[in-house]
Amino acid sequence: MTIQDRAHLYNNSDFGQQFPDSRFMVSDRWISATWITGNNYKSLSSRSEDDKPFYGSYPPGWLKRMWTMFPDAKRILHLFSGSLSAADAKPPHAHEFALRLDIRAELKPDIVCDAENFAASVKAYAPFDLMPSDPPYSVEDAEHYSTALCNKRKVLDQCHQTLRKGGLLLWMDQSIPMYSKKHWKWVGSISMYRSTNHRIRGVMFFEKV
C-alpha cells in the first residue's frame, strides 16, 4: 500500500468525511494535512490516580484517526509510550501485537528499555510494520519526564534496524530529526493543533528504504 493509498483511506473515513478540512493533500511525492483536534484537556495517556493529563501525551483522537490509515499494520511498536494503556495501544483491526516501549518501569510498558538501544530487546517481535513515536521534544520536556533528552539520531538508527522495508515511522516532534536519505524517505507530514495555549506538533512520516 502506498502512502497515497493511506491518505485516501483517511480522506474517505468517518473522520475525513466529518472534518473535510482535515483531509490530506496528495501528490506523487508525499501527503500533507492539518489536523485541529480541539479543546480537550484530557490526553489519551492520563494518570489513573487523579485523571490529570500525562505531560506530553498523545493529543486526543490522534490514534483513532491514525488507525484509519493503517488497516494492514500487524506488528506495531509505540516508542516513548508513556502511560498509554494496553487497550488504547491496540488498533481496532486484526493484528499480531501492539507493544509499548518506555524507559520508565513505573509506567508499566510492555518493554522497559532505552529508546537509543532497543533493537536487541525487541528482536523476537521484529520486523515491525508501524512505529508511532512521541519523544521528548526538548531538555525541558525531558526534565518533566525525569529522563535525559534522547539522541534522536541513535533512536532513528534503532528504528531502522527493527522496521521492515517499507515500514513507517510516525515521528511526532516540534522539529524535523536528522535522518539519512539512504535509510529513510520522508513521505508525509501532519501539522497538529489542539487549542489555545497548546504547542503545535508535527508528525513526520518516514518510510524505511
How would you describe each model-predicted region?
Residues 81-117:
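Class I SAM-dependent methyltransferase SAM/SAH-binding core
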Residues 129-149:
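A short SAM/SAH-binding and catalytic strip from SAM-dependent methyltransferases
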Residues 94-96, 163-167:
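A short helix->loop->beta-strand "cap" motif at the edges of active sites that frequently abuts
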